């Protein structure tokens, strides 16, 4: 009951309270006499889909940054908005950001291949993976979500002194590209309580790893290790990819006859990876839906692009999904994060598919 009350308050509280502001940054003063961007039917569906679970569902209109739904379930404290206030490992959903970045650097190409036989060994360390054919190229590595491929690709990027003579420069450039896609910092949503996640840079790794190299931090390649994101950031990343490289600050207010959305919220942010790299990423996300980890959301009426994640956790793993639809002229980007939900393909992915179908097809 507390969860239901919280999500209802998320929709109506902005009308009941005089002014919200993000006090720490002092960025926004949000008046209350303007309508919300939330789609009531979508919000209701997302609420029902998360019933009895702990986690969040977020949907964004990629063309505007408007929040279409934002649901947070918390079994312990319903006052915490997990969509913007909780930082998690993104798991394999992070591989799409890796792909766009490493492609633009020239560290990989669409033809790059790595072997995987239920994982791989390096320096006595085993990276596990599920069974699939081997070797894989880039599009297949996204579609099949191969852990071995992404760890080897990231390791080789970090250790490639021909590409980057100084490893710190390599990691700092990587960090900058991730930041340009809205990762590792708060996005500036017009709600209080947003946290920024974590994308490590060279200074952070120097402090925490003491003599790091590609092998010791290769976990970052598959979205594990120190990387942390919020569900809102994952949804925004899906919007970045849907737009082939740009995004708008996610926001929950829209214009009315008496109030205009803060111009800060309508600025178009351009990410650093190339448009061509995003097209290849989208091809991989389509492969995931056609014959990879996202087959549960194939739809005969429109083309869906998706990426699953299974985020390692001390207890049961978290189930993660992010995606958008349609492939051309996208209307909705979605992220789903279910704590202790297991495989992303089994739970978060089908939930995300239902959210997209409701918005596009109205059912």
Which residues does each PLM region occupy?
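Generic structural signal for hydrophobic residues
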Residues: 42, 98, 173-174, 355
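Bacterial N-terminal signal peptides
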Residues: 7-19
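Conserved, well-ordered alpha-helix/loop/beta-strand core segments that scaffold catalytic motifs
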Residues: 26-55
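Active/ligand-binding-proximal structured segments within catalytic/core domains
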Residues: 91-100
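Short, gly/Ser/Thr-rich active-site loops of penicillin-recognizing serine hydrolases
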Residues: 262-269, 351-363
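Beta-lactam-recognizing serine transpeptidase/beta-lactamase-like catalytic domain environment
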Residues: 24, 33, 55-56, 61-88, ...
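Positively charged n-region of N-terminal signal peptides that target proteins for export
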Residues: 1-7
């Amino acid at each position: 009951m507390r969860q239901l009350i919280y999500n209802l308050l998320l929709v109506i509280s902005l009308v009941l309270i005089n002014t919200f502001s993000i006090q720490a940054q002092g960025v926004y003063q949000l008046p209350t006499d303007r309508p919300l961007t939330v789609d009531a039917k979508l919000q209701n569906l997302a609420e029902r889909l998360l019933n009895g679970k702990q986690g969040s569902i977020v949907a964004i209109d990629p063309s505007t940054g408007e929040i279409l739904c934002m649901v947070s379930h918390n079994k312990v404290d319903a006052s915490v908005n997990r969509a913007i206030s909780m930082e998690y490992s993104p798991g394999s959903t992070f591989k799409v950001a890796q792909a766009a970045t490493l492609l633009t650097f020239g560290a990989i190409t669409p033809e790059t291949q790595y072997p995987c036989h239920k994982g791989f060994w390096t320096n006595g360390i085993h990276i596990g993976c599920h069974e699939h054919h081997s070797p894989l190229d880039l599009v297949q590595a996204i579609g099949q979500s191969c852990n071995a491929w992404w760890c080897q690709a990231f390791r080789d990027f970090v250790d490639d002194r021909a590409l980057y003579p100084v490893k710190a420069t390599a990691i700092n450039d990587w960090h900058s590209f991730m930041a340009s896609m809205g990762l590792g910092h708060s996005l500036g949503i017009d709600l209080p309580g947003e946290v920024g996640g974590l994308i490590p840079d060279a200074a952070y790794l120097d402090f925490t790893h003491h003599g790091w190299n590609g092998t010791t931090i290769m976990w970052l390649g598959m979205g594990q290790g120190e990387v942390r994101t919020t569900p809102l950031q994952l949804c925004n990343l899906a919007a970045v990819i849907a737009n082939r490289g740009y995004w708008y600050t996610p926001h929950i207010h829209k214009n009315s006859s008496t109030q205009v959305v803060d111009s800060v919220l309508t600025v178009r942010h351009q990410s650093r990876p190339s448009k061509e790299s995003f097209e290849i990423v989208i091809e991989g996300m389509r492969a995931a839906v056609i014959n990879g980890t996202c087959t549960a959301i194939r739809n005969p009426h429109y083309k869906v692009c998706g990426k699953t994640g299974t985020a390692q956790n001390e207890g049961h793993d978290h189930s993660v999904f992010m995606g958008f639809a349609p492939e051309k002229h996208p209307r909705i980007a979605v992220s789903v994060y279910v704590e202790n939900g297991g495989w992303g393909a089994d739970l978060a992915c089908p939930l995300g598919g239902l959210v997209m179908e409701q918005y596009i097809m109205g059912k």
